[in-house]
């Protein structure tokens, strides 16, 4: 099993505070039933969100959704 580290995600989102916000927002989406962009397996929503960010499927744009 590949382990996801914060460093893997910081390559995609350089600001650690933006990374925290994006990962938390995406984890809430996944926990609420949104389909994952990576194979979820038996991982928790937070790990799935970090894997999506590290893979480049999700970025800071997730924070702008729903705004005009």
UniProtKB/Swiss-Prot annotation:
Q: What is this protein called?
A: DNA-directed RNA polymerase subunit omega
Q: Which species is listed as the source?
A: Chromobacterium violaceum (strain ATCC 12472 / DSM 30191 / JCM 1249 / CCUG 213 / NBRC 12614 / NCIMB 9131 / NCTC 9757 / MK)
* Pfam families with a match to the protein in the record: RNA_pol_Rpb6 (PF01192)
How does this polypeptide assemble, per the annotation?
Answer: The RNAP catalytic core consists of 2 alpha, 1 beta, 1 beta' and 1 omega subunit. When a sigma factor is associated with the core the holoenzyme is formed, which can initiate transcription.
Matching NCBIfam families: rpoZ
Functional description taken from the UniProt entry = Promotes RNA polymerase assembly. Latches the N- and C-terminal regions of the beta' subunit thereby facilitating its interaction with the beta and alpha subunits.
Give the domain of life: Bacteria
BP term (GO), one: DNA-templated transcription
What reaction(s) does this enzyme catalyze? RNA(n) + a ribonucleoside 5'-triphosphate = RNA(n+1) + diphosphate
Question: What GO annotations for molecular function exist for this entry?
Answer: DNA binding; DNA-directed RNA polymerase activity
Keywords noted in UniProt: DNA-directed RNA polymerase, Nucleotidyltransferase, Transcription, Transferase
| Membrane spanning stretches | none
């Amino acid at each position: 099993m590949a382990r996801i580290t914060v460093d893997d995600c910081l390559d995609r989102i350089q600001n650690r505070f933006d990374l925290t916000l994006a990962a938390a927002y995406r984890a809430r989406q996944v926990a609420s039933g949104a389909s994952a962009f990576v194979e979820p397996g038996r991982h928790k929503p937070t790990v799935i969100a970090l894997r999506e960010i590290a893979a480049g499927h999700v970025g800071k744009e997730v924070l702008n959704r729903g705004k005009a």
